[in-house]
UniProtKB/Swiss-Prot annotation:
The lineage of its organism: Eukaryota, Metazoa, Ecdysozoa, Nematoda, Chromadorea. Residues 408-454 are annotated as: Disordered. This is Transmembrane protein adipocyte-associated 1 homolog. The chain crosses the membrane at residues 80-100, 113-133, 151-171, 180-200, 224-244, 262-282, 290-310. The keyword Cytoplasm does not apply. One of its GO terms (molecular function) is G protein-coupled receptor activity. Keywords: Glycoprotein, Membrane, Transmembrane, Transmembrane helix. Its main location: membrane. InterPro entries: TPRA1/CAND2/CAND8 (IPR018781). One of its GO terms (biological process) is G protein-coupled receptor signaling pathway. Residues 445-454 have a biased composition (Acidic residues). The keyword Protease does not apply.
Length: 454
């Protein structure tokens, strides 16, 4: 997404020529004719006639420089961006109490990161608009400050974009402050070089070359090529992310289950395509591209913070504090007595949980079933009926095994049950009811009083 500011309404668009600085400026000046292939592209008179087309193109250029009446030097462009952002900031202030309460009761670093991005982006945008309105735009230093503010706000927005993608695609692996910091550093490695190139392209002294006596001085074609390529690349990235559920990549990353994330990606694809088309039209010396640039840039700097809020934060902030089923929440399951997290190799195969393989559930030492613990020697001893002992894992057809995973560490009942079960010889196949898993992936069977020796 490009940057539009007073001295540069769109990436690589040069300084604005106004009636205050150009005596030859005339409000009734006719609009320069576009190339023939551009005129052919917009020549469908069933939708828009040539006169209306010229008016629209003129409006797309005027909106960046015209100021409010009454002696104020406030541009319509700044006011149009400021008012929606002020309304959204008021909305955020009204939600501030509930947001703080949610952040204090919850333990989600991703939620805090998204909240910070929304508030900071909105505040920086408002500060830029207010400061731009106070500038006379006649001093070169003030113009440079205004350009710098636009670069800063673009940097914040671009970083927020990459953070949203990172949190959305890797939310199952980002559940602590350190992982959030690593993800943020990764996004900075992309946004900082992009912003540096943008500064080099935009902060240049340019001349009035091919569009005389009109609003804009256009820089060299290299800036537009960078603009087209950067916008097209971002559009391809978002489009590829939208296609991830259709390819095998979903085996390696946990994608958001709801559709709001993909709607967000679709909107960003549309905005970046409009930016790329607008830059391409301006590259071919057509002022029609200013309409594409103006619309996409306005939507971006006005609606992006609300899009982030309603896509990633609204549902999570409305959930009760004890609900851990947020969009970007992932936690290990705790055992019943709170003795710690379950092992990383724990893949239960019950409804609502994911298991890569049913065999992984029973991935443990086979010989452990045929040993018992000798208290006198403090070690496990192989059962004498090693070759004849058989305990197949067959569920009874009469009763259904209880879907309960027992994770009590150091349970005396389990040790007593295991020793009693292994101490009695088995001459044939017996059916036992599997209750669940014990410590270290061991099996826990239903109590069978007939097999226990007191």
């Amino acid at each position: 997404m490009s940057v539009i500011f007073h001295e540069n309404p769109g990436t690589s668009l040069g300084s604005v020529v106004s009636s205050d600085t150009n005596p030859s400026f005339n409000h009734t000046l006719s609009i320069e004719t576009s190339p023939e292939w551009i005129d052919d592209l917009f020549s469908n008179v069933s939708f828009i006639d040539s006169t209306t087309h010229q008016v629209i193109r003129g409006f797309c250029r005027d909106v960046f420089v015209y100021r409010l009446p009454g002696g104020f030097r406030i541009r319509y462009w700044d006011a149009a961006i400021l008012i929606p952002n002020l309304l959204f900031l008021l909305f955020l202030f009204l939600k501030c109490t509930s947001v703080i309460r949610k952040l204090q009761t919850g333990n989600s670093p991703v939620l805090r990161a998204f909240t910070l991005l929304v508030y900071v982006s909105t505040l920086v945008n408002i500060i830029r608009c207010v400061y731009s309105m106070t500038l006379s735009m006649t001093d070169g230093i003030e113009q440079t400050v205004d350009q710098t503010l636009w670069i800063i706000i673009k940097f914040f927005y671009l970083t927020a974009e990459f953070c949203a993608l990172t949190f959305g695609l890797l939310f199952g692996h980002l559940d602590n402050g350190r992982s959030i910091l690593i993800a943020l550093l990764g996004t900075l490695l992309v946004s900082i070089p992009h912003t540096a190139v943008q500064v080099i392209v935009e902060m240049k002294i340019i001349d009035n070359s091919w569009l005389p006596l009109t609003y804009f001085d256009i820089e060299s074609d290299g800036g537009f090529v960078f603009w087209v390529l950067s916008s097209a690349t971002l559009a391809l990235v978002y489009f590829f992310i939208m296609c991830l559920p259709l390819v095998c990549c979903q085996k390696y990353t946990k994608l958001p289950s709801n559709g709001s994330f993909f709607i967000y990606c679709m909107m960003m694809v549309t905005l970046n395509i409009l930016q790329s088309m607008g830059a391409a039209l301006i590259l071919f010396k057509s002022s029609d591209g200013l309409c594409f640039v103006g619309v996409s840039t306005y939507v971006y700097f006005v609606l992006y913070p609300p899009i982030i809020y309603f896509t990633f934060l609204r549902r999570k902030l409305k959930t009760p504090p004890n609900n851990t089923s947020g969009l970007f929440m992932y936690r290990k399951h705790k055992d019943e007595q709170g003795s710690g997290d379950l092992p990383d190799s724990y893949y239960p195969r019950f409804s609502g949980l994911t298991s890569p393989s049913y065999d992984d559930l029973f991935d443990y030492d086979r010989d452990a079933r045929f040993t018992h613990y000798d208290i006198s020697t403090n070690e496990y001893v192989q059962h004498p009926h090693y070759n004849t002992y058989s305990t197949p894992l067959i569920m009874s057809t009469v009763e259904t095994a209880e879907s309960t995973v027992t994770t009590r560490t150091g349970s005396d009942d389990f040790a007593h049950h295991r020793d009693s079960m292994l101490s009695e010889p088995s001459t044939g196949t017996t059916t036992r009811h599997l209750k669940g898993l014990g410590p270290q992936g061991s099996l826990v069977f239903e109590e069978d009083p007939s097999s226990l020796r007191l």
